[in-house]
From Swiss-Prot:
PANTHER family: TRANSCRIPTIONAL REPRESSOR NRDR. Negatively regulates transcription of bacterial ribonucleotide reductase nrd genes and operons by binding to NrdR-boxes. This is Transcriptional repressor NrdR. The keyword Ribosomal protein does not apply. Keywords: ATP-binding, DNA-binding, Metal-binding, Nucleotide-binding, Repressor, Transcription, Transcription regulation, Zinc, Zinc-finger. The lineage of its organism: Bacteria, Pseudomonadati, Pseudomonadota, Betaproteobacteria, Burkholderiales. It comes from Paraburkholderia xenovorans (strain LB400). GO terms for molecular function: ATP binding; DNA binding; zinc ion binding. Residues 49-139 form the ATP-cone domain. The keyword Metal-binding applies. It holds the Pfam family ATP-cone.
Length: 160
């Protein structure tokens, strides 16, 4: 790898560490020519499907957009950045596992909502209100009622 400081063609790896999720390798490098150190990150590049938008246009999958939209929904919520990264990684693995070359933006939105639902209910409602274009309070009430039904324990049967 070229040194970013002096452009020397060969650098030495001083230290390598695998990230907690095992998806990235962090390498500390040193240039023998200028003796400066720098860090590189190595990640497997996989071919994620293209995203088909509502208008039919196609765009490349952009991890940063998913992270940004989740961060916006989770703004001022007690969720760690690592949890967001892990959620985005799960979305990517689901897309890769599908084997599809294209994914509809609606499906991608549903995957994001599922991850937000598991992370933080407030963030889920925030995202859903924008994604599903809520127009009145009753739509918020419907989502909240879904949560109430899902979180309440089933009633015991009255069989004797």
């Amino acid at each position: 790898m070229h040194c970013p400081f002096c452009r020397h063609a060969d650098t030495q790896v001083v230290d390598s560490r695998v990230s907690e999720d095992g998806a990235t390798i962090r390498r500390r490098r040193r240039c023998p020519a200028c003796d400066k150190r720098f860090t590189t990150y190595e990640r497997v590049e996989l071919a994620l499907p293209s995203v088909v938008k509502k208008d039919g246009s196609r765009t490349e999958f952009d991890r940063r957009k998913i992270v940004a939209s989740m961060q916006l929904a989770l703004r001022k919520r007690p969720v760690a950045a690592d949890a967001i990264e892990a959620a985005v990684a799960r979305i990517e693995y689901q897309l890769l596992g599908s084997g599809e070359r294209e994914v509809r933006s609606e499906r991608l939105g549903e995957l994001v909502m599922n991850e937000l639902r598991a992370l933080d209910t407030i963030a889920y409602v925030r995202f859903a209100s924008v994604y599903r274009r809520f127009e009145d309070v009753s739509e918020f009430e419907d989502v909240i009622e879904e949560f109430r039904r899902a979180s309440s324990p089933p009633k015991p049967s009255r069989k004797r």
